[in-house]
Amino acid sequence: MLDILYFMFNNEESVRFNHLKREIGLTATTLSRRLEELNNQGLVDREVFAEVPARVEYKLSEKGRTLGPILESVFSWVERVNS
């Protein structure tokens, strides 16, 4: 789930499901489950638009944004350790 949160933190705008799927490389089922968990935890906001076909966008909630500095530290550490 850290990969989803980190990607969303680095993208200020709302992100559509398929964009996330392409960028992060998860299966649709896995991504759907993780987004649902993040939404239930209040870390990600989900907005459904009344359009055909249906459009759903995700973005970090205010609560999720507070994780930004922590995520940056974790991913910086991972880069240092793996280099």
Model-based region annotation:
Residues 6, 11, 48, 69-83:
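Amphipathic alpha-helical dimerization/coiled-coil segments
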Residues 3-6, 31, 45, 56-61:
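Long, contiguous secondary-structure blocks with strong helical propensity
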Residues 17-49, 53:
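Canonical helix-turn-helix DNA-binding module
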Residues 51-72:
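Basic, amphipathic "hinge/linker" alpha-helix immediately C-terminal to the N-terminal HTH DNA-binding motif
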Residues 1-27:
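N-terminal helix-turn-helix DNA-binding core of bacterial DNA-binding proteins
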